[in-house]
Amino acid sequence: MNEGNSLRDIQKKITLPEEFNQPYLVSSYDDFTFLINSVWRQYGGWYSGIPSELKPPSLFEIGNAYIDMAGGKENLLLFLESLLAEKKYKEASVIIDAISAVEPDFYRDLKNSIYSFLADQEPSLMAKGIYNFNIDT
């Protein structure tokens, strides 16, 4: 934080020491990333260090920008499917959150696939619950 790193940068840089990689220390409820978030909020406050997150546009506005940039919702669907083929589910989840605000019915199945996959891969019960909660039935 004192070096000017953003929260996202810190989340990628900090890892637990190898001696904590023990079967009896596996976290099943929480996640190490969530602990980093808590420390950031305690000492750094609510600002993530990323200027675009200071006063962000709505997900609806971002979703429209993604759809326009792709040349339409069908092109964006193809792009997202290519991300999934490359196993880039987290990247796809950022986009699907925004475009689902614009076209929830059109992207519902893809959104459900993304969050179902992420939930299945997640060891943290907290993250698993959040991913599953966002699956539309």
Please tell me what each predicted stretch does.
Residues 1-137:
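Accessory terminal helices/loops
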